Design a protein with these regions (language model features):
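Short C-terminal tail/terminal secondary-structure segment
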Residues: 236-260
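Rossmann-fold cofactor-recognition segment
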Residues: 35-50
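N-terminal Rossmann NAD(P)H-binding glycine-rich loop of SDR-like oxidoreductase domains
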Residues: 12, 16-21
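C-terminal helical subdomain
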Residues: 93, 149-154, 158-161, 180, ...
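Catalytic loop of short-chain dehydrogenase/reductase
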Residues: 75-77, 81, 103-174, 185-186
């Protein structure tokens, strides 16, 4: 990608903020989206606000967008309903809403945010992710948005990974490369409070990380910047795990998988 205009959501903190800094350091113009302190302020959990956010981004980029990184997301202690609405349906509304602008961009690319929780969460099923993909938002909220189940977060992130794989050919026919990163445990303002919750702190400590430490937001941003760049021009439909080796350690023979 040449110096272009890239929309990044969740730029007020964490991976989104680090991605904005990284892309701007490379000379790109970044249109930031977040609840506050952004070029476009809005709440993607609210259906009524999503189209306005899309319209404002399109206005700021002049109708042509070269890249999109929907980083906005929530984890614990956010409610399960919020996880469903923000992490999947709000994200997908913006991605689909900005497709027409991406089609007018130069060598456009989208990098979605999945998670390595997709491959290490007990009880998570493929059917959970397919439910996000196939059901409408309110149906999914009714199913997963109540109670204390931990499934909504990894299910939504698995649905994003599936969507990238399923739609990469279709979007490539419009000239848009789709890929995703799957971060592991990253030291951000969203993750640190989990250490104050005994159950979550114990779970985090149990995660094996061959690299020997948590990841940094700038390390995820670097992977995102690479996937957006022309250096990744032949990479399409991939989910890149950036997790310090956790996925490879736990599932060494899963990828690549031969055809049946």
């Amino acid at each position: 990608m040449n110096m272009g205009t890239i929309c990044v959501t969740g730029t007020a903190s964490g991976i989104g903020a680090a991605t904005k800094v990284k892309l701007e350091s490379l000379g790109h113009k970044v249109i930031g989206v977040d609840l506050r302190n952004a070029d476009v302020c809005g709440d993607i959990s609210k259906v009524a606000e999503r189209q306005r956010i899309v319209d404002e981004v399109i206005a700021l980029c002049g109708g042509a967008l070269d890249g999109l990184v929907p980083c906005a997301g929530v984890s614990n202690p956010a409610s399960n309903e919020l996880k469903v609405r923000v992490n999947f349906y709000g994200t997908m509304a913006l991605v689909n809403g900005l497709r027409s602008a991406l089609e007018k961009g130069v060598d456009p690319a989208v990098v979605m945010i999945s998670s390595n929780s997709t491959t290490m969460t007990p009880g998570l099923s493929i059917e959970d992710a397919l439910g996000f993909l196939n059901d409408d938002e309110e149906t999914t909220v009714a199913k997963y948005g109540v109670g204390d189940t931990y499934i909504p977060y990894p299910a939504g992130k698995l649905a994003i990974a599936f969507w990238v794989r399923m739609k990469s050919n279709e979007w490539m026919q419009s000239g848009i490369r789709l890929n995703a990163v799957a971060p592991g445990v990253i030291d951000t303002a969203m993750t640190r409070p989990l250490l104050d919750v005994p159950v979550m702190a114990e779970r985090l400590k149990m995660i094996p990380i061959p690299r020997g430490r948590w990841g940094r937001a700038d390390e995820i941003a670097s992977a995102i910047a690479f996937l957006l760049s022309s250096e990744a021009s032949f990479i399409v439909g991939q989910v890149l795990f950036v997790d310090g080796g956790t996925d490879a350690l736990l599932q060494p023979t899963v990828h690549p998988h031969p055809l049946p």
